Curated annotation (Swiss-Prot):
SUPFAM superfamilies (UniProt xref): ApaG-like
Gene expressing this chain: apaG
Matching Gene3D superfamilies: ApaG domain (2.60.40.1470)
GO biological process: error-free translesion synthesis
Stored InterPro entries: ApaG_domain, ApaG_sf, Uncharacterised_ApaG
Protein name, entry field: Protein ApaG
Transmembrane feature ranges: none
Residue span(s) of domain ApaG: 3-127
PANTHER family to which the protein is assigned, alphabetical: F-BOX ONLY PROTEIN 3, POLYMERASE DELTA-INTERACTING PROTEIN 2
């Protein structure tokens, strides 16, 4: 698992390789990742937008931006946690993801929180640092 805290918001990510959806012979590798966001602060916040930077094993970069996560813009009161699962395909057997969530404080001010960088490794390649 990978974890990072920004402004009392903790983001934890756990990636999973999806062998049943991957086709290594066709250079198609798929991962799911489970994200848990915990508000450890004293103010209510809302997740407004996501921004992912996905890099494959040969350095090709794809950026993904959009409102919310999995169709939701969750509100997290102090002590609340929100979890979701999503996924990404790559044309290489490994890669890395990192990103940010744009949050809004209860007073309407926006700020970014970090999504920790995490490695996407398939069993079809020896693990390495990306």
């Amino acid at each position: 698992m990978y974890s990072q805290t920004t402004r009392d918001i903790e983001v934890t990510v756990k990636p999973f390789y999806l062998d049943d959806q991957s086709s290594p012979g066709d250079n198609h590798f798929v991962w799911a990742y489970r994200v848990r966001i915990v508000n450890k602060g004293s103010r209510t916040v809302q997740l407004l937008r996501r921004h992912w930077v996905i890099t494959d094993a040969i350095g090709r970069v794809q950026e993904v931006k959009g409102p919310g996560v999995v169709g939701e813009q969750p509100v997290l009161r102090p002590g609340d946690a929100y979890e979701y699962t999503s996924g990404t395909p790559l044309p290489t057997p490994s890669g890395i993801m990192v990103g940010t969530y744009e949050m809004e404080d209860e007073d309407g001010s926006a700020f970014d929180i970090a999504i920790p960088a995490f490695s996407l490794d398939s069993p079809h390649e020896k693990p390495r640092l990306n």
